[in-house]
Amino acid sequence: MAHLLGSQACMESLRTDLTDLQGAIVDVFSRAGPVRFPSWKFPDRMACDLDMVALLEHYDHVPGDPEFTQLSHAVLLELVIDRLLLLLQSCMSYLENLGSEQMMPPAQAAGPCMSVGLTVRRFWDSLLRLGTLHQQPLPQKGANQRETPTSKPTTKGEPARSPEYLTTKLIKPSSPVLGLPQTCQEPESIPVRASLQFPATTFKNTRSVHSQTIETALVPCDACASVQGSLQKVGKVVISLCQSQNLPSSLGQFQQLVQDSMGLRPLPAATVGRWAAEQRKDLTRLSKHVEALRAQLEEAEGQKDGLRKQAGKLEQALKQEQGARRRQAEEDEQCLSEWEHDKQQLLTETSDLKTKMATLERELKQQRESTQAVEAKAQQLQEEGERRAAAERQVQQLEEQVQQLEAQVQLLVGRLEGAGQQVCWASTELDKEKARVDSMVRHQESLQAKQRALLKQLDSLDQEREELRGSLDEAEAQRARVEEQLQSEREQGQCQLRAQQELLQSLQREKQGLEQATTDLRLTILELERELEELKERERLLVAFPDLHRPTETQIHGGRSSSVESQITCPTDSGNVTDHMERQVQSNDIRIRVLQEENGRLQSMLSKIREVAQQGGLKLIPQDRLWSPSSKGTQGATPPVQAKSTSPGPLGRQHLPSSRTGRTLLGQPCTSPPRQPCTSPPRQPCTSPPRQPCTSPSRQPCSQPSKSLLEGVTHLDTCTQNPIKVLVRLRKRLSPGRGQASSAHQPQERPM
């Protein structure tokens, strides 16, 4: 066998076997409910929660990796053992349910981890107990045949059937019809089993009633097909929404698994319950995603306001900067014109100074010639000349104080006049000439220095002008870029603003629709509360007769017939039988009146819905977002509501175990097993002829499904505005009243 490890043919055979085993397990789960035992392969997880599709995709034959292929082969063998063990455990649970005469088991806790041998032994023990239980009613068959009269036919073309025929069918059931849902097969045998528990003397005043059996029900009812079709359409819409939002879809995986295992056959009750649970997960995930999108929208609106304020500030800053640059350019132009004017003036002054310097040089030559003549006379005045030289040095150091130097020269001239009268005229002339020459020299030097400074300043001004022109060009280019960027940002901001305004308008419309739906729901809740108070008052009136609840009569239901029933009156130990019968008649009158009032309300509500559908009030959302086809129009949205009222499936039985009204209006204690209110009465709309009225007192347990129908009908107008949220609300409304039957269908959800 070692050479076969990793063989592709062997692995494909194992994968096929695993697929078949999983299909058989799903079929058993639909009849017995999911069993919660630890997995043999993965002890830390439940066997019913393993994702076989993901495991088969992971452990596959890889041509380039022999080690992984051999590991996958071993894992597939272990998975075959795990699935076989789970199949035995689920079959064991199904056999226990048959032995205890229960339709579906209650919610089971996680079972212990069992070995293969222990599981096989427990399965064999359960099978032996079932065989013993089926052999016990056989001795009573002859007595039932002798004491039970032949039943009369109730409809044309149908033969009469006796209770012994039904008992034989129960003890030796035939193979189920292919494609018939389990919800329409199993409940038939339960009332007949209950009838076997009473003595044979009770059949003297009884008569058998015709009912629809497995042989007559060749196809599933239209209501089941309609409900499942609507559920699949809604599931497709939910899966498409999850895919469009890039969200994981639990319903998509479960739908693929159901299609692989069931194909196009009708789904059983447990599969429909699991489908609804997975769909509820996806709807919850979508609601969380919508809340996150709303938070992002609010954050985007805040950012939009901030960007709008920032854009206004930038526009103001840009305008201020443009004004400052404009003023700076005007000032620069004015300074440039002033500098040009000063330059022309300086050029004219320099030309004038040059001509003056030439004339002064000629005068200086003449004065030098005259001073040479006067030098002979100036020998006597050397001391004064030294002082004059010192004064000349001081005059050279203090160029700016020209007037003070001239005053000092005049003082020196006065001193020279005082020193000698002889050289007064010569000294004064010499001083004047000297002062004039010195002033001319100083003036020439100052002019030259001023000219050099002006030339340097002119060069610096030229350089600064070039720099200013370059900076002005750069500023113009930058301003153009800033204007272009601001224009693009303004256009982008306007586009974003328009998009956000459109989104805001759509959200406001959705908000208005939700507010309208909330108002309608509140009005519906108030109306339902008033009806609940009335029903409680009527229930108190019925409870006021305690004698009616004594075990004085027993009902025997044949098959699924609830329109006609036989009552067997047994002698009581206390009271008068006539009084009890009169009180029973009074209570039956009260029940009939309650049913007539409820039928009147349902008829009025149905007429209102039809009027709204004819007026086109249900066309509020595009057809591609609804679960009904676009070709059906407004009337295509009403079949799911009607399917709720006539479906015998799990939707019709979910409210019955938790309804007090359905139990107290029967006028007798619940002597039969607790499954009786959930089997025959709710299934009558699927099997009874259309012409039979549903007015029998034994069908009073149907009042709770009618109430759920009223709740579904009143919320139909809100489905057109937001179908996803309404589905979530309807699922939450239906989930508290499912009772034990619904909890048995509900699988254990994995932690997200």
From Swiss-Prot:
It comes from the Eukaryota. Residues 671-692 have a biased composition (Pro residues). InterPro entries: CCDC157. Residues 135-163, 316-336, 620-707, 731-752 are annotated as: Disordered. Residues 135-154, 628-648, 693-707 have a biased composition (Polar residues). Residues 276-544, 579-615 form a coiled coil. Residues 316-329 have a biased composition (Basic and acidic residues). This is Coiled-coil domain-containing protein 157. The lineage of its organism: Eukaryota, Metazoa, Chordata, Craniata, Vertebrata.
